């Protein structure tokens, strides 16, 4: 089966069409702007899968309708998913703009005095606004000389932010969310909303009963040689934690081996259902070998599966990590309890950064006073105002231990193409696999247990759906926090010491939901959240605006908020603008 091609970035050099001197004097400068833009993007960006980003430049500069149409024909044939229009001069606004209604688009007007690039930028954006096709504005802060071919830092930042978000939009379009099972324990996020996926993300939902997973395991619809490799890998790399179950619920060695085997099989089969596996065709299972074209998935698990069979913790944790028995590879996006809305936040984070995502319960707010009362320890540093306990038995990626290192030796989570095998091994070594607690998981299983290193910048996100409003996005930038071991042990044992933990301190602003840490917890819209490495809230905001998802809560500096220019016409408060603009334009793929 032919592999679907990755979306490309289209670069549209536009020009003043007046011949006999004007156009001729601008051809080289205009095309060089396009080439410089393409060079920047191909050098600095990758797709989430790790592949190089490709740019497609119009064959000619665009002065009017005919050349715009020729450019569009080229872009349509080469899977261009977003466009950047560049110009150093005046051009004919509505005659030269990109009119595709669902393709993210930006315009860079060169800030120079010899020719009015800024005037075209304003004219073209006015046309976009009047026609209801929002576009992003890029205009350098400082005047450049006409022969200056450099890209200023502020222009570069906007080009890269737009491109990262635009590639995420284009990469999600046409893919599916694999809903493996139904509603888990009444969790609203697992009431999968097909209209949301179709209208806002351009995706389909593939609903599959969990009996399909059972069938694949029972009928051996998997690669048996790979299963043996996975078992050998686990035997080499898994460290097991204590079994905290009562004696009557503890499993013997043979039973534990069967649980491990099925847990690894679940990972293999869920992966095969998402992306397909040509090895299945070799054993006569051609239909199953195709998969469901899923870019993200969720597994219900509780309780209809977990009351009888091993839980999804091991499978989810391995799939969401950047490595397994096949080595370092792109992490999958698999939401525990089929929380599709948290799955979408995971998908956004992965598409923007290429990194694994940490799924967690937003479990407990610990005030400084409560921690001092319980442990005698006084919080300080990043934790001085209190912390939030992020913990869940399920799908936290092992990358979340932060045993990978950046160029300065700091703990982090890297894009998978930068991770060494030694770093993958370090994450495994930092993880223990604890037998599942019987009172929660009667069918057994293994929960990963690790503790996230402190001082690491993270962005916590969540998508919620509000009746009458639609989807909204929450964003909280902050840091992981390291507590003294005895303090961590006391606090962790009050919840469940067999699960992975991140102690999170959001960055406070003194206003609204970021008045204090308690307010962050109180304003969080659901029981789950996602941690994405780095302070990347600005990228999430730009992506959300492309999809027409308003942001209801964030602590990103106002100077970093980057949305389409038409948002400014929707009022004077930038967050109110976001709501009114998203309501005005409606979902990107209106249905």
UniProtKB/Swiss-Prot annotation:
- InterPro entries tied to this protein: Fuc/Ara_isomerase_C (IPR004216), Fuc_iso_dom3_sf (IPR038393), Fuc_isomerase_C (IPR015888), Fucose_iso_dom1_sf (IPR038391), Fucose_iso_N1 (IPR012888), Fucose_isomerase (IPR005763), Fucose_isomerase_dom2_sf (IPR038392), Fucose_isomerase_N/cen_sf (IPR009015)
Q: What GO terms are given for molecular function?
A: arabinose isomerase activity; L-fucose isomerase activity; manganese ion binding
Give GO BP annotations, semicolon-separated. Answer: D-arabinose catabolic process; L-fucose catabolic process
S-S bonds: none
Q: Entry's Pfam families?
A: Fucose_iso_C, Fucose_iso_N1, Fucose_iso_N2
Pathway in which this enzyme or protein is active: Carbohydrate degradation; L-fucose degradation; L-lactaldehyde and glycerone phosphate from L-fucose: step 1/3
- Documented EC number(s): 5.3.1.25
Q: Name the family the entry cites.
A: Belongs to the L-fucose isomerase family.
Protein name, as recorded: L-fucose isomerase
Query: From what organism does this protein derive?
Result: Escherichia coli O9:H4 (strain HS)
């Amino acid at each position: 089966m032919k592999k679907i091609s990755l979306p490309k970035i289209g670069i549209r050099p536009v020009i003043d069409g007046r011949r006999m001197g004007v156009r001729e004097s601008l051809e080289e400068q205009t095309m060089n702007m396009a080439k410089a833009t393409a060079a920047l993007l191909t050098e600095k960006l990758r797709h989430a899968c790790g592949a190089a980003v490709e740019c497609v430049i119009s064959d000619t500069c665009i002065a009017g309708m005919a050349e715009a149409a020729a450019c569009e024909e080229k872009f349509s044939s080469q899977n261009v998913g977003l466009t950047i229009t560049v110009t150093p001069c005046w051009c004919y606004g509505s005659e030269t703009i990109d009119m595709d209604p669902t393709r993210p688009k930006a315009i860079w007007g060169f800030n120079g005095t010899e020719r009015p690039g800024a005037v075209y930028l304003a004219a073209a954006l006015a046309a976009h606004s009047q026609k209801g096709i929002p576009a992003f504005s890029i205009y350098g802060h400082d005047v450049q000389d006409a022969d200056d071919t450099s890209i200023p830092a502020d222009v570069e930042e906007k080009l890269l932010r737009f491109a990262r978000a635009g590639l995420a939009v284009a990469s999600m379009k046409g893919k599916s969310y694999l809903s493996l099972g139904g509603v888990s324990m009444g969790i609203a996020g697992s009431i999968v909303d097909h209209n949301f996926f179709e209208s806002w993300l351009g995706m389909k939902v593939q609903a599959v009963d969990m009996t399909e997973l059972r069938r694949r395991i029972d009928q051996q619809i998997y690669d048996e040689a790979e299963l043996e490799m996975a078992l050998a890998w686990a035997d080499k790399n898994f460290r097991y934690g204590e079994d905290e179950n009562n004696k009557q619920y503890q499993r013997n060695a043979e039973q534990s081996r069967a649980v491990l085997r099925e847990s690894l099989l679940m990972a293999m089969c869920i992966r095969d259902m998402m992306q397909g596996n040509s090895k299945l065709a070799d054993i006569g299972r051609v239909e199953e070998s195709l998969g469901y074209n899923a870019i993200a998935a969720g597994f219900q698990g509780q309780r209809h599966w977990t009351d009888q069979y091993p839980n999804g913790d091991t499978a989810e944790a391995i799939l969401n990590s950047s490595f397994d028995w096949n080595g370092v590879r792109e992490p999958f996006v698999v939401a525990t309890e089929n929380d599709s809305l948290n799955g979408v936040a995971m998908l956004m984070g992965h598409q923007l950064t290429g990194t694994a995502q940490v799924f967690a319960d937003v479990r407990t707010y610990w005030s400084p006073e409560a921690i001092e009362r319980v442990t005698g320890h006084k919080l300080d540093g990043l934790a001085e105002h209190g912390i939030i306990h992020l913990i869940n038995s399920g799908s936290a990626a092992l990358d979340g231990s932060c045993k990978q290192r950046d160029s300065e030796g700091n703990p982090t989570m890297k894009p998978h193409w930068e991770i060494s095998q030694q770093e993958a091994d370090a994450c495994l070594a930092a993880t223990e696999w604890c037998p599942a607690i019987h009172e929660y998981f009667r069918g057994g299983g293994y929960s990963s247990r690790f503790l996230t290193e402190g001082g690491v910048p993270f962005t916590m996100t969540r998508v919620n759906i509000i009746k009458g409003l639609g989807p909204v996005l929450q964003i909280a930038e902050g840091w992981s926090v390291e507590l003294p071991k005895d303090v961590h042990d006391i606090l962790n044992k009050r919840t469940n010491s067999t699960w992975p933990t991140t102690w999170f301190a959001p960055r406070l602003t003194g206003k609204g939901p970021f008045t204090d840490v308690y307010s962050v917890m109180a304003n969080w819209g659901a029981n789950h959240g996602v941690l994405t490495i780095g302070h990347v809230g600005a990228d999430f905001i730009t992506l959300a605006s492309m999809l027409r998802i308003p942001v209801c809560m964030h602590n990103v500096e106002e100077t970093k908020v980057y949305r389409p220019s038409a948002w400014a016409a929707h009022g004077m408060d930038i967050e109110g603008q976001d709501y009114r603009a998203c309501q005005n334009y409606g979902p990107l793929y209106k249905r």
